[in-house]
Design a protein with these regions (language model features):
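Serine/threonine-enriched low-complexity regions used as flexible
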Residues: 1-14, 63, 76, 139-191
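Serine/threonine-rich, low-complexity linker/repeat segments that form flexible spacers/stalks
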Residues: 8-72, 81, 177-182, 186-191
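Short structured motifs
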Residues: 42-49, 65-67, 126-145
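Short, acidic/polar linear motifs in exposed loop/turn regions
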Residues: 69-71, 84, 165-167
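A surface/secretory-pathway sequence property marking extracellular, secreted
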Residues: 79-127
Length: 191
């Protein structure tokens, strides 16, 4: 899915006090750019919605998302699809993914995700994790009273792009867009 997920549920009528967990929790994504000038005035280490860069400069990007309650899933697919303006050149080697809580930060190993450049549909790149649930369950093994794992961890994907010479062809333009879409498992009964 790419937005919300919903499931039908069967209610246990033999036990009128049974708890029913509605699985409509889904991840969201926020995109930020790290402004290199004026970090002190911007705050948040310069992470902002816009940035001012010169041709040839490295432009740091960050996608922030979250792990929803995925206890009903055996596996959980997670992928970011990005469409960059042609004035930006993507650096696939710069991709880093962190899963974190207030107490712990885990950086995914390069073999735990895949970077696909020019995957089709006009996209510049796609970064996918085949089973982020297995990683979170292994690295953040926190159980609740029902012996289910506790989710809600932040997922942060960082990468760099370079403002290339194509930016000079359109200097009066207000900005160079970079759009992201998050794809994730939306059916707990299907791997």
């Amino acid at each position: 899915g790419t937005h919300s997920a919903a499931s039908m549920c069967i209610v246990n009528t033999a036990n009128p006090k049974a708890d029913v967990n509605i699985k409509s929790d889904y991840p969201t994504v926020i995109k930020k750019i790290q402004e290199d000038d004026n970090k002190e005035n911007i705050g948040n280490d310069g992470w902002n919605d816009i940035g001012d860069f010169e041709i040839g400069q490295t432009v740091p990007y960050k996608f922030e998302s979250n792990i929803p309650n995925i206890n009903g899933y055996d596996t959980y697919y997670y992928a970011w699809h990005d469409v960059m303006d042609e004035a930006l050149t993507f650096d696939p080697d710069s991709v880093a993914i962190h899963v974190r809580t207030e107490d712990k930060n885990y950086e995914l190993a390069k073999d735990e995700f895949q970077v696909i450049t020019n995957p089709g549909n006009g996209e510049t790149f796609k970064v996918e994790i085949q089973d982020i649930k297995a990683i979170v369950d292994r690295e953040f093994d926190q159980k609740n009273d029902l012996n289910e794992n506790v989710y809600g961890q932040k997922v942060i994907l960082r990468y760099n792009a370079t403002l290339n010479d194509k930016a000079a062809e359109d200097t009066g333009r207000p900005g160079f867009e970079n759009d992201v879409r998050l794809e994730f498992s939306n059916n707990p009964d299907h791997d």
